[in-house]
Amino acid sequence: MLDFTFHMPTRIIFGAGRLAELGRTRLPGRKALVVISAGGSMRRTGHLDKVLALLAQNGCATVIFDKIQPNPVLIHVNEGAALARAEGCDFVLGLGGGSTIDSAKSIALAAANPGSYWDYIQSGTGGRKRPERPALPVVAIPTTAGTGTEADPWTVITREDTNEKIGWGDDSTYPALSIVDPMLMVSVPPAVTAMTGMDAFFHAAEAYLSTARQPSSDLLALEAVSLISQFLPQAVKDGNSVQVRTMLAWASTAAGLCESLSSCISHHSLEHALSAHHPALPHGAGLVMLSLPYFEVMARFQPKRCADLAVTMGEDIEGMELREQGLALVTALRKLIAAVGLDGLKMSDYGVTREEIPALARNARETMGGLFAVTPVDLREDAVIAIFEKAYR
């Protein structure tokens, strides 16, 4: 029986060159905390100067917060929130990859509410409080095609002292405005292009398998899987094509919409445990490492849906039995991972040991248990351990 809720309040301005509209579109405030990464890429590429100039053109004052790490951490969220309050900022603008925009959302919530951001986390050691006020408005300007955070309310932050990487979001953390300009993505290096692109792929594939899915998320998920399968290898080989970058930017946004209308599943929970304990591990890389044994399990129990994904990726399944049709997804995934140069990734290269696996499995279920609830397979702790063991090298 068809039963769903469709809610998507974000205004999305999409297209090459459309960043210029930041200088004239209506903004949700008059003073922005501009959140960027600590790595300096937004300054080196000139993206920050361009955004600051456009905001000034629009009569908006700015304060810069530039401490965000690839796996963003609680201390910086609380620090950014304190700065926003002290400077009287009335909205937060995230410029950069998913980590930066996620941080902007968390800072926006913490700036509007008392205490620590972690007081409002609903699992693990979180305080499980309800926010007293909605988050400050958020503007998202992504410079990578990966998380799709410009099209969903979710934010993922790590508490370092407890090795917990936990998601949060409500209606107030949907961006009020997102500007997706593929021109900002042309400078992204091949390895980052590959890892962020695979993150977008898994958002879409997981949303298609999730028990929270709905008709609109299915359509968007298959669109994203098709585009990423076709264009991500091209972008890794030559990232200068604006047309290719545009297709990937749309795929990432479409996958982000899937996260709003459906949900990721426990594949993401397993990865969050990995990168919570090993923050140098890029999120997309961790997902790739876990993906083949994880989706092999999904294919055994959800062969029809996995077969749909395989066909969308270009696999010929005609004449196969249903079980083999489902497992064709694993074949297609292995090909895509190799095509984007990520088939050599190893957990051990990031300091992960086999001895950690039971603790990682527990962490995944304790901190991101909500995604297990929408996974179409009942993955108990022994099954999670088995996936980690098979993925380990």
Could you tell me what each predicted segment is?
Residues M1-F91, M347:
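ATP/NTP phosphate-donor binding region
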Residues W154-S262:
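Carboxylate- and glycine-rich phosphate/diphosphate-binding segment that chelates Mg2+/Mn2+
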Residues T211-L220, A235-M247, S262-H267, L281-G284, ...:
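Flexible, glycine/charged-enriched surface loops at secondary-structure junctions
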Residues C306, M313, I317-R393:
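C-terminal charged capping/lid subdomain of soluble metabolic enzymes
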